[in-house]
UniProtKB/Swiss-Prot annotation:
InterPro entries membership: NADH_Q_OxRdtase_suD, NADH_UbQ_OxRdtase_49kDa_CS, NDH1_su_D/H, NiFe-Hase_large
Designated gene of the protein: ndhH
Organism: Mesostigma viride
Superkingdom field: Eukaryota
Protein name: NAD(P)H-quinone oxidoreductase subunit H, chloroplastic
Keywords of the record: Chloroplast, Membrane, NAD, NADP, Plastid, Plastoquinone, Quinone, Thylakoid, Translocase, Transport
Length: 391
């Protein structure tokens, strides 16, 4: 009888593989088609975001944060202004709070849509990609009307938002909500009971409830394993406590459960938007008290700074000598910032807790013993963006 012994094969997937969702590199050890080991290599998109924050005022740093998770930029802005607001005890007006919630939930829908399309393409279904782009374009049109930018909005400010909603925007947004809910049902009819789809995702990448908690997972990854943990309910930030909605969760813990959680979240987000639009109060859209400014250093007339640096110090207030951790429920999980002030206009320490970085840690555990083709399905179901993983 002929016996063949094969050595394990080590291959490198990425960093420019179409299914890697950015510049992730996986060093995969294979025995035939079976995965023996997998080692993620990070850092290709590292831009020293935390160090930059320590040399900028909060106002100056706002345009940078939209480059972490560049598909859900409202959340990175929200966390950036929430930290100094909590430290300095700045009240956010009711209207601004409602506007923020509407923007955050629109951003969540856009992020989940752009997760769904590529995830289905990874599995082999190309059609949904074109459907999700159609809906996502409408959300970006709403963003452009309100903020002037389709993606990097730079809309949140300490104590409120940059500008009020333009005339007719609320009606346009309500029209979109009415249009979008049946579309989610359409996605479900198209995808959920498809036998090929179910073969690829059911019982693939299983995470138990205990594992999810021990690995520190958050967001849809945690809720798909049977843990009902949503920071919008737990922390009641902004005006989520005044609206009627349910936490979406599943108990199966596989790729199918994570898909169903995100689909359910799109529905709930639309309901939140509809309620917020109908209940939005009048009043100011920013707290003018937040403009308690202590100017930075003034440059002398015609000195080195005036000639070569050529910038005015941006008006800002000092961050008190305290430390604080703030968090929001981003589409991918718990996005948090640990801020340490030093009675200075610059933060002394700015630590980013990005959900993607923590969620991707479990990847080697999930793919071990699976087939090579399942790596794409499992990685897609985790939903990572390398901008926030590498920072």
């Amino acid at each position: 009888m002929l016996q063949t012994k094969t050595d394990p094969m080590v291959i490198s997937m990425g960093p420019h593989h179409p299914s890697m969702h950015g510049v992730l590199r996986l060093i995969v050890t294979l025995d035939g088609e079976n995965v023996i080991d997998c080692e993620p290599v990070l850092g290709y998109l590292h831009r020293a975001m935390e160090k930059i924050a320590e040399n900028r005022t909060i106002v100056q740093y706002l345009p940078y944060v939209t480059r972490w998770d560049y598909l859900a930029t409202m959340f990175t802005e929200a966390i950036t202004v929430n930290a100094p607001e909590k430290l300095a005890n700045i009240e956010v007006p009711k209207r601004a709070s409602y506007i923020r919630v509407i923007m955050l939930e629109l951003s969540r829908i856009a992020s989940h849509l752009l997760w769904l399309g590529p995830f289905m393409a990874d599995i082999g279904a190309q059609t949904p990609f074109f459907y999700i782009l159609r809906e996502r374009e409408m959300i970006y049109d709403l963003f452009e009307a309100a903020t002037g930018m389709r993606m990097m909005h730079n809309y949140f400010r300490i104590g409120g938002v940059a500008s009020d909603l333009p005339y007719g925007w609320v009606d346009k947004c309500l029209d979109f909500s009415d249009y979008f809910l049946p579309k989610v049902d359409e996605y479900e009819r198209l995808i959920t009971n498809n036998p090929i789809f179910l073969k690829r995702v059911r019982d693939v990448g299983f995470i138990s409830r205990e594992e999810a908690i021990n690995w520190g997972l958050s967001g849809p990854m945690l809720r798909a394993s049977g843990v009902q943990w949503d920071l919008r309910k737990v922390d009641n930030y902004e005006c989520y406590g005044e609206l009627d909605w349910n936490v979406q969760w599943q108990s199966d813990g596989d790729c199918l459960a994570r898909y169903l959680v995100r689909l359910g979240e799109m529905r709930e987000s639309t309901k939140i938007i509809q309620q917020a639009l109908k209940a939005i109060p009048g009043g100011p859209y920013e707290n003018l008290e937040a403009r308690r400014l202590s100017k930075g250093r003034k440059s002398e007339w015609n000195n080195f700074e005036y000639q070569f640096v050529g910038k005015k110090p941006s008006p800002t207030f000092k961050i008190p000598k305290q430390e604080h951790y703030v968090r929001v429920e981003a589409p991918k999980g718990e996005l948090g910032v640990f801020l340490m002030g030093d009675d200075n206009v610059f933060p002394w320490r700015w630590k980013i807790r990005s959900p993607g970085f923590i969620n991707v840690q479990i990847l080697p555990e999930l793919v071990r013993g699976m087939k090579l083709a399942d790596i794409m399905t499992i990685l897609g179901s985790i939903d990572i963006i390398m901008g926030e993983v590498d920072r």
